[in-house]
Amino acid sequence: MIFSSRRRIRGRWGRSGPMMRGMGALTRVVGVVWRRSLQLRVVALTFGLSLAVILALGFVLTSQLTSRVLDVKVRVAIEQIERARTTVTGIVNGEETRSLDSSLQLARNTLTSKTDPTSGAGLVGAFDAVLIVPGDGPRTATTAGPVDQVPNSLRGFIKAGQAAYQYATVHTEGFSGPALIIGTPTSSQVTNLELYLIFPLKNEQATVTLVRGTMATGGMVLLVLLSGIALLVSRQVVVPVRSASRIAERFAEGHLSERMPVRGEDDMARLAVSFNDMAESLSRQITQLEEFGNLQRRFTSDVSHELRTPLTTVRMAADLIYDHSSDLDPTLRRSTELMVSELDRFETLLNDLLEISRHDAGVAELSVEAVDLRVMVNNALGNVGHLAEEAGIELLVDMPVDEVIAEVDARRVERILRNLIANAIDHSEHKPVRIRMAADEDTVAVTVRDYGIGLRPGEEKLVFSRFWRSDPSRVRRSGGTGLGLAISIEDARLHQGRLEAWGEPGQGACFRLTLPLVRGHKVTTSPLPMKPILQPSPQASTAGQQHGTQRQRLREHAERSR
């Protein structure tokens, strides 16, 4: 029995689970619709405020109406009881031969002969009468009428010689419901004679109920009308705003000819005119910028191609002079070396400009092959390793033991890595540079981390801009052109990969290259974190011991390159 009870409890919770999930889903949907629909919020707010106002007005009006109706009833009751007291006094003092019971009953019958509460539900002033002569010592009380319906609290006022009234619920043979009971002492020969009149409040209750129903019906109709009016009014505002939103979205997608229709001369029309003026200005500026950009790209491409021929001629002449520099005096020999060095830098700049122009023209293509990315890292280290040795900068390399095969353009990937490592050496401030590689099932990532000056907030995007430098006064050991990172991010995008940067002032910077292992795969995650979780001291000797083999390989590369 215990286990079956537990099963029933789980069954109840199990049935409530989908209901709770359904309620949660419904709440989320309503929340989304509420946040996204201005028209719904306007209508709902109008409905809520109107409902609150109607309820408040209904309560006030109903209270005032009830008070007025009862005040009228009380005045009628006071007038009626004054006449009734005169009638009762005359009957009781009339004939001494009648008994007290007979006199009281006769007086009650006389008072109620013209007002029947059972049939006077719709008559104003219908009442029943109660007469009471309290007992004195052994003598019992003498009464006439439904004395048990008179509240004791009201009788206390009458016994004290005061006229008073009270609202109470009565139950008699002909009536059951709320009633006004008014009482007064009499000045007859019978001592302490109490007179009470019971006025049913059926008519007044029916009047108040009718008014409440009418007000409720009218309030509902008014709510519907106000909500409809709010819907129509808000629609007059929301429709142009939605139209402007759709046109703005299409404008952002490149449809520069989209404009808002102008109707009338109201605020919405002025909004449409202002929007169209803004769109026209933006369209004109965008067109001009596109023309300037095309002209700039065409100029860069043309100049780069035109400079190739004279540069080749100058290069041949410079190489010829350099080959015979041993026959020259030291001054001319030094000038020859400077000329060859500057020609190398100029040729690098020209090649970068040509590469940028290819990316701008959309004609850059990949020459994909399956290669071991560890070899790409080692090749890049071999090309720029001499810069680190000349500056006394330690390169810490951490790569997987197994091969990391990826379908990439080896030339472009090696250029990316070479640019990242050279950039880290330039900004490391003689502190070590850490290169890490990791791979998962779909992607491979390489991070280049330095502990130098770092990046200020917002510069992690600017570093990939063309010719941008965080500190123009800083000397570049690598002799870069200012286009390396701009070309690198274009090469990464060409592989459908990512090249991202992170940095903090005084904490250094980290560049992360993430590439798909298979061509065409979309990169969504990276095996390596962007922001370093742990930042060990870059001067730790243990790191140098762990990566001694890699540094030895780097030195061998540097020796072979010489």
From Swiss-Prot:
TM spans (from-to): 42-62, 213-233
Stated role: Member of the two-component regulatory system MtrA/MtrB. Seems to function as a membrane-associated protein kinase that phosphorylates MtrA in response to environmental signals.
Subcellular location: Cell membrane
Alphabetical keyword list: ATP-binding, Cell membrane, Kinase, Membrane, Nucleotide-binding, Phosphoprotein, Transferase, Transmembrane, Transmembrane helix, Two-component regulatory system
Classification via PROSITE patterns: HAMP, HIS_KIN
Chain ranges of the Histidine kinase domain: 302-519
Location of the region described as Disordered in the Swiss-Prot/TrEMBL record: 526-562
Membrane topology: Multi-pass membrane protein
SMART domains associated with the record: HAMP (SM00304), HATPase_c (SM00387), HisKA (SM00388)
Gene Ontology CC entries for this record: plasma membrane
Gene of this entry: mtrB
GO molecular function, a single term: phosphorelay sensor kinase activity
InterPro entries cross-referenced by the UniProt entry: HAMP_dom, HATPase_C_sf, His_kinase_dom, HisK_dim/P_dom, HisK_dim/P_sf, MtrAB_MtrB, Sig_transdc_His_kin-like_C
Reactions this protein catalyses: ATP + protein L-histidine = ADP + protein N-phospho-L-histidine
Biased composition (Polar residues): 536-551
Protein name per UniProt: Sensor histidine kinase MtrB
Biased composition (Basic and acidic residues): 553-562
Keyword Kinase: yes
HAMP domain location: 235-287
Domain of life: Bacteria
CDD domains in the record: HAMP (cd06225), HATPase (cd00075), HisKA (cd00082)
EC number: 2.7.13.3
Enzyme class: transferase
